[in-house]
Every structure is written in C-alpha cells, then in structure tokens.
C-alpha cells in the first residue's frame, strides 16, 4: 500500500457466510470488532471494513463483488487474497478469476499461498477444533497471537475458592466459540 501511496485496508464479513447459507451457527474466533482491532494493531492494517453478510451479498455475482464492492465502494487498487479465497454467488469467484479480473482492469493482485505449521494447514476450521478440544496454547500458535475471549462473569459452585485458586466463570459473547469446559490460566 505504501509503495502505491495508498492506505492499507482489510475487508471482512460480520459472520461466516457458511452460517447464512446453512442456517447453522458457525462459532466465531472473535467478535467482528475484536477481529478488526487485531488486524489493525497486530498486522498494521490502517482500515478494516466489516460488511454484513446477507442475501444480497450471497447472491452478488463475483464480478460485482470486485467492481461494485471492493473497487467502487472501498476504492481498492490492489487486492490480496488467500489461495483458497472464494467469493460471489455460489462461490463462483476464485483466485484465478480474481487474478484475471485484476489484470484486465489495471488492479494489482497478490495471492497468499497456503500456510502450514508443523505440517498442518493453518485454517480457522483447524483453530476452532483446537479450541473446542481445550488446546488454547496450540491454537494461539496457529493464530499468531494469544487467543482471548471476553464475556460475562457469572457465579459458579465455589470450587475455585475451595482449592485456593481464584477463578471466574465466564459466559462468552453470543456466537463466539466455547472452549472445552475446564479451568484455564489467564491474564487480565
């Protein structure tokens, strides 16, 4: 972005498109505002645009996703996407169509290759499975930052008080992934 004299920006949805399509909740790793904050503070991106995923978004032709949303609305001049990025109605847009569109319309385009750690592809699905299994440290390694969760503290059975370790029972925000039931060491 600096080389082009532009501000860096990231685009994300307020929820997983899979949730809207299937009607089944997909647990989020963060709230949209937490995600935007992580992208800004930990990855140095200047702007983060969070767009609602709805029926209009779901049925938008892939060409319109680029031309109307990314270029016209957000003034994109260079697009960066992951190797498995799919977009537009019925996921008809893919990285090859993105590259082709960008080349034909004078836009820059970079595709980020698959990222692996310890022989495993880094993906939100895998990270969710680690968190659901209670493997928070390993999930944090795949995230590239410590996993954090916010929620409401509620009264429990006083087990922590009896064992001399102060504990807090946390109810995560709605739609946020629930960790495996257990006791976790944290920092406030």
What annotation goes with each model-predicted range?
Residues 56, 63-67, 71-188:
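Active-site cores that bind ATP or allylic diphosphates and position pyrophosphate for catalysis
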Residues 1-72:
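Core alpha/beta nucleotide-donor-binding catalytic domains of modification enzymes
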């Amino acid at each position: 972005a600096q080389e082009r004299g532009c501000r860096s920006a990231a685009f994300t949805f307020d929820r997983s498109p899979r949730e809207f399509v299937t009607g089944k909740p997909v647990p989020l790793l963060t709230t949209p505002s937490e995600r935007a904050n992580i992208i800004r503070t930990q990855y140095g991106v200047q702007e983060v645009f969070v767009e609602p995923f709805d029926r209009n978004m779901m049925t938008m032709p892939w060409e319109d996703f680029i031309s109307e949303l990314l270029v016209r609305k957000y003034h994109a001049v260079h697009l960066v996407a992951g190797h498995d990025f799919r977009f537009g109605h019925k996921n008809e847009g893919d990285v090859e169509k993105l590259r082709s569109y960008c080349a034909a319309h004078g836009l820059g385009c970079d595709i980020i290759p698959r990222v692996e750690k310890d022989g495993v592809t880094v993906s939100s699905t895998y990270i969710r499975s680690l968190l659901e299994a209670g493997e928070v440290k390993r999930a944090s390694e795949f995230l590239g930052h410590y996993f954090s969760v916010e929620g409401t503290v509620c009264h429990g059975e006083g087990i922590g008080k009896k064992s001399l370790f102060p504990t807090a029972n946390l109810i995560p925000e709605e739609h946020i992934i629930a960790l495996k039931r257990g006791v976790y060491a944290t920092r406030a």
